[in-house]
Structure formats: C-alpha cells, structure tokens
Amino acid sequence: MAKIKSVIGFEVDSNEIRAVEISRSSGTYSILACGKIPLQEGIIEEGFIRDADRFNIALTELMQNGGFRATDVVVGVNNENVVMRYATFPKVADDKLRNMVLLQAQEFIPIPVQEMEIDYVVAGDGVNEDEQPVTNVMLVAARRNMIEQYINVLSASKLQVVDVNATVLSLCSGLQSSVVGDEKYAVLNLTEDLVNFIVIKGNEISMVRSIQIPERIEGSVKRLFAGKEEADDIEQIGTVLGQETSSSVSYYAMQNQSSPIEKIFLLTTLNKNAQLVNGITEIFANIPVTVPDYYTANKFGLDQQVINEFAGCIGLAIQALEVK
C-alpha cells in the first residue's frame, strides 16, 4: 500500500454505516470527519449488500453531510463471512511462513479456500508436545465475493478501497496501544451479527472464537442495536453473553491452566454497556468484566462515548496511516 496522508476507516453492519476520516502529521493523528447513518432493513443481509442503490444513497448522504474529503478507505468487516481460527504450524524461516500458511489453511477453515481471501497474524512462537519449535498464528479468512462486492460498490461512489481488515483486530490493537498493560486479557465483542471472544497478552493471541448471534436472542439484539429495545432485552442478552463467556473461559482454562485470563473487556458500539456488564456478571463473576475507554491520551476533541463507539473505524484508519 502506498503511503497516504488521510484515510477513512469504514465499518458496515446490518443496521448502519460508520466512518471516521483521520490524518497524520508529524506523528500526530487528527480526526477530520466522523459520522454514521442507519441502513434500512434488507440493504445488508448475511454480510452482503443486497440493495446497492439504497446503500449508495445512504453512503453518499453520509459522506456529504459528514464533511468527508478523503477518497482512500479501509473497510472493516466482522460478519458470518469472516472466519478467524487459531492455528499452529512448524517453525520455518519468516520468508517461507506465508506459503506454509496458505498451503495448510484448509485444515483449519470450514469453507473451501478457493472462495476465500486469507491473511494471518503471527501470535507468537512456542513448542509442541514433542518439544519441536512451532509458530502460532491467527488465520483470518473472508469470502472473496463479499470483498469484491464492497470494492465495486464503494468504487462506484468514487472511493478507493486500500485495504480490508477484520474490525475486531483493529479494536484489539486500540486496546494494546491505550488501555492494557502486561496482563492476559480477553475481548468479548458484540455486534448485531456476531460475538467474538479473543484472548491476548501483548502481541500474542492465544485463543479466538466467533459465534453467530444465538437464535433465541436475535430479536433482542436487533432491537438493542436499533435503539428500540424492550424491557427484558438487555437482561436476556446479558445472560447469553455470560453463558458464552463462561463456556469460552472454561475451554481456555483447560488448555492453559498456568496462564489464566485476568480481565475481560466488553466491546460494542452501544451506550448500554454498563447494563450488559451487569447481566454478564450475574451469570459469570469469576473474572472482572469492564468496558474500556479508547484513546484517552488523545480524545481528538470528541466525547469519550463517541470515541468508544467509533473505535473500530479509528483503529482501521490509524493502522493504514502507520504503513510506510
């Protein structure tokens, strides 16, 4: 990717588009534009744009009313068309690792690799049961036709897609840069489409799990993200998140008895996180669950709640601007 001066971090899910334009000068990041726009039901389904015309109308309105000027865009995706898997490979020279990962990726990904764009993040080195050196990676695979669709639709609106990344990884990067220290922590990320559970220490990822929203709370989650929640929706969602957290932590503990999780961060774009934490801790109280504040050293002149809501977009843009 060529070096760029400003870029738009861009997220799409079933109910809205979010975008942040960021510039970098002398190592300092500045937010030039920030905004979101709701999407009508049916425009996005199963991670795909089903109605490109209505999508472009909403996108154009967001870009114009939000004062966006950059044309370079980094798209963040986190839906059922993105697969993340923790995998271990024999230790090889750095220049040979990518070929090995691509050749063996099918063993870990439940979708034909011919249909996927595959990338990976090195999660650290170790040894296997036979004391042989290994490299741990997190595989990230996204359906090629979904990526191509976003590139084509955004190009029709005169936007240039310079990269496509997993949004949850940009959120994790933001935590590492501004929130966490040396502790081992877990990220519990709730979107309208998925729940992610990722265990991290420093730059090393040691577990990743993604599940679709359970059918029994689909309606509650949709209403909550639309701002139309009913009286017991938050309680029901919190209960399920608590159960999923308990299951994930138990599985991790069985595999890593000597390295326990010390803290869990709940991530959403909602303003109901405190209530969700209460629901989670009613079910699972073994490890502290908190809601992080992102980029507190530089609030970019915006309210902290806004920074937290757009943390994924901010992280996507910052990562692109860091590329030399």
Task: For the regions a language model picked out, list residue spans one by one.
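Hydrophobic/aromatic-enriched cytosolic interaction surfaces used to assemble or bind macromolecules
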Residues: 1-324
